[in-house]
A protein has these predicted regions:
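Intrinsically disordered, low-complexity linkers and terminal tails enriched in Pro/Gly
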Residues: 1-2, 102-107
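A structural signal for small-residue-enriched, beta-sheet-centric alpha/beta enzyme cores
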Residues: 74-77, 146-176
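Short, low-complexity, polar/charged sequence segments that are solvent-exposed and flexible
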Residues: 93-97, 133-137, 168-170
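Single, functionally critical "micro-switch" positions that shape active/binding sites
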Residues: 118, 176-177
Length: 177
């Protein structure tokens, strides 16, 4: 067993495996200033991320550049009219708006899987990570009947149920921020 870089800090070795705030320490009865400031910054970034809109046009370009446009990309929207309503009324993010219901028509043959890229509470996370993850997963689904990729705004996880039902999908994979 190796000795930690700082023998006074037994947690140093474990911190390399996580960005979580573990064993942040104290000075007297208070937390260290650096950890308080780091938490404040992370909290502000999270609050900003919640209000960011999903850049659907950029996501469409990323899907095309990754060679995934052959899957056919559909756009959907939760029932919330805007981001403020989405945040105040989680129930509206769990169902499609009328226009999206009309756009998502059933397939004559069921799909094995449909992928949904959804903004959730962090559109930035979906924007950054969904396409590479989708590429990696699709590379292993050779014999699967893969349905269209659905890009959904103002979406909660449960929106995948309605999307899967409307598109006749056996499974839905939600890539949600």
């Amino acid at each position: 067993m190796s000795t930690p870089a700082n023998p006074e800090d037994p947690w140093a070795r474990l911190r390399q495996f996580t960005r979580a705030r573990i064993a942040i320490g104290r000075t007297g009865h208070a937390q260290k200033t650096a950890s308080i400031l780091a938490f404040g910054l992370a909290h502000a970034q999270a609050r900003d991320a919640v209000h960011l809109a999903l850049d659907v046009a950029a996501l469409d370009v990323a899907l095309r550049d990754a060679g995934l446009d052959a899957l056919h990309v559909l756009h959907a929207h939760g029932a919330a009219a805007d981001r403020d309503q989405y945040l105040r009324r989680p129930d509206l993010g769990r169902s499609l708006d009328a226009e999206s219901r009309a756009r998502l028509v059933p397939s004559p043959q069921p799909y094995d899987v449909v992928f949904v890229i959804a903004d959730g509470l962090s559109a930035l996370a979906a924007q950054r990570h969904a396409v590479p993850l989708l590429q990696a997963v699709l590379a292993r689904l050779h014999d699967w009947r893969v349905g269209p990729v659905v890009v959904a705004r103002q979406s909660r996880v449960a929106l995948g149920d309605e999307i899967g039902e409307r598109l006749c999908a056996r499974q839905v994979v939600m890539l949600i921020g």
